Regions:
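N-proximal low-complexity "stem/linker" segments adjacent to membrane-targeting elements
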Residues: 1-30
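Acidic donor-binding segment of Leloir-type glycosyltransferases
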Residues: 25-72, 76
Length: 341
């Protein structure tokens, strides 16, 4: 096992999205404090040559700022979970900052993070608020946060395990303590698209998940998911959309992970996580399914019922809204988001 050096690795699981990939590199270059290295694992997309060329163009620019850019071409399509695991493994520095290849860093993102990790050097993971944007980060759609103050979520702090999903469901800007994560590496949950939730469940039961007060990244909305090309994903997931079966598979995996890790540490993290998925997170899923056909909507309902996540009044109400109002239901979701801001 390669020993971790003190410092930061920015880790990018790259797949297609050439334009967004270069925008991400620009955002890293423009930060007030740069990482020690940028590690990119390209997972066999059709745009590999273009992505590699952009990486080569930026390598010398980052070297001038003492930041090493490493572009790795995976021999086979590993899929999301295995690619994240590989990024953690091949990184050289203690703090591995994951970011999707269509998200962006904010100017002081890494400075804010460094100040926190300097004070919490044994923390297992770090999460963050983030700005939601579509095409232009200077025209944000909103601000996503789960806490008004800096915090550490853990079983020892008597936090609710619902904070595991709230803090780590979105991968952009999540920080992994590489020394802590390497011994936990497993292929068991490949295809779940939630390797970070596996790590977060472990973090919650051990040294905790830190949460920053200020945002460090921008999370892009609107791009379709590209999961489904790897062998571990192709049976369920379809590139370009979250199908009902795909979403149910993801949430079923979260429940299985929480049961496994809860048993490992003798901590009940399953109950609150299940309620979190059934109530708060169902809002996001039904919002994403505004305007879909009745058949797709009924399939979503059926899949949620199979994993017992349709028993609460909230998913039933949201299903009804989508069923009767179709695309006009978007007005309801926008109103709720505006009130919640």
């Amino acid at each position: 096992m390669k020993v971790s050096l003190e410092g930061f690795s920015v880790a990018i699981p790259a797949y297609s999205r050439v334009k967004e990939f270069e925008e991400l590199l620009v955002s890293i270059y423009d930060m007030s404090f740069l990482p020690n290295e940028i590690v990119i694992c390209e997972d066999g997309s059709k745009e590999r040559k273009e992505l590699s060329a952009i990486g080569s163009q930026w390598k010398s620019k980052f070297q001038e700022k003492n930041c090493n850019l490493i572009f790795i071409e995976n021999e086979i399509n590993l899929g999301y979970d295995a690619n994240v695991r590989k990024l953690i493994e091949v990184s050289s520095f203690k703090w591995v900052v994951l970011i999707g290849n269509d998200d962006l860093f904010l100017k002081d993102g890494l400075s804010i993070l460094k100040e926190f990790t300097d004070r919490n050097e044994n923390i297992s993971m770090v999460s963050r608020p983030f700005i939601r944007f579509s095409d232009d980060i200077n025209k944000p759609l909103g601000f996503s946060t789960i806490d008004s103050k800096e915090n550490i979520y853990s079983n020892s702090n008597k936090s609710s395990s619902k904070m595991i999903f709230r803090s780590c469901g979105f991968v952009g800007g999540l920080v992994i303590n590489r020394n802590w994560a390497l011994p936990l590496a497993t292929k068991k949950y490949d295809g779940s698209l939630y390797y970070q939730i596996y790590l977060a469940c472990n973090a919650f039961c051990t040294n905790g998940i830190g949460y920053l007060k200020s945002p460090t990244v921008g999370g892009r909305t609107g791009n379709p998911p590209l999961f489904g090309s790897a062998e571990s994903e192709s049976e369920i997931h379809i590139p370009g959309a979250y199908s009902a079966k795909g979403r149910a598979k993801m949430w079923k995996s979260v429940l299985e992970i929480s049961q496994d890790i809860g048993t490992k540490y003798k901590v009940d993290i399953y109950k609150d996580l299940k309620k979190e998925l059934m109530v708060k997170q169902s809002f996001h899923v039904f919002e994403m399914n505004v305007g879909v056909g009745v058949r797709e909507l009924k399939e979503l309902k059926s899949e949620l019922k199979k994993i017992e996540l349709f028993n609460h009044i909230v998913p039933k109400f949201l299903f009804t809204i989508n069923y009767f109002f179709g695309r006009n239901a978007l007005i309801f979701y926008r109103l709720i988001r505006k009130i919640a801001q």
